[in-house]
């Protein structure tokens, strides 16, 4: 079998159409809606890419919520549990994994969460489909309603601890570390808070709404645009959002801009919902 290279961190619809049925390629459908947890699965059952398996944010891509909220609303899953789930849906260490969601819903960040989690487990062969489900349909991509039954394999995790920042890391960060809040401006400023019990942001954070990583059609902006909006030429960065989900497009965007995931491009996984679980932690409002 000829060598096959997966473009990362983004893959085009044309590449996926050409290689969709290659046995090394696995596709994760990560469509979801925070407002209605069943939306994504219903959409998947109504039509998905042939061979794609559904990756549920709550049950597959997150761990159990802890009493008191420590770890946030979408805690990182246990690495062994995530690895076992990946193996159960046919994703092995040699698999080339493509993740997609539907950016037309305004919540095009679930595929990036899946991408980041695989990278956290040490899996380099993973990419997000540029343009997602919308682009696939626009290009005439095949749609299936069959639920696949992939052969289980073994996925051995190699956890990359330096991709993650904790609340203690955020508190102890030096002046040279940039802290990015990926939520909408109103939530960052503390003017509205539709989900969490406190409004505002972590003191010292700057606001870079995750949606700026995409253009109006749901495609990812180029490396130069990402570097400009994320100040990617300089300080190491810790990025957060409400619960460690919508921050992940900014992490991918920084990688596009030349800063790979690692010590200079980390996710505060618990994010705002973890930060406010301890009332002793300070909260800021307004602009910084």
Tell me the role of every PLM-derived stretch.
Residues 1-288:
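Cytosolic catalytic domains that perform sulfur/thiol-centered chemistry
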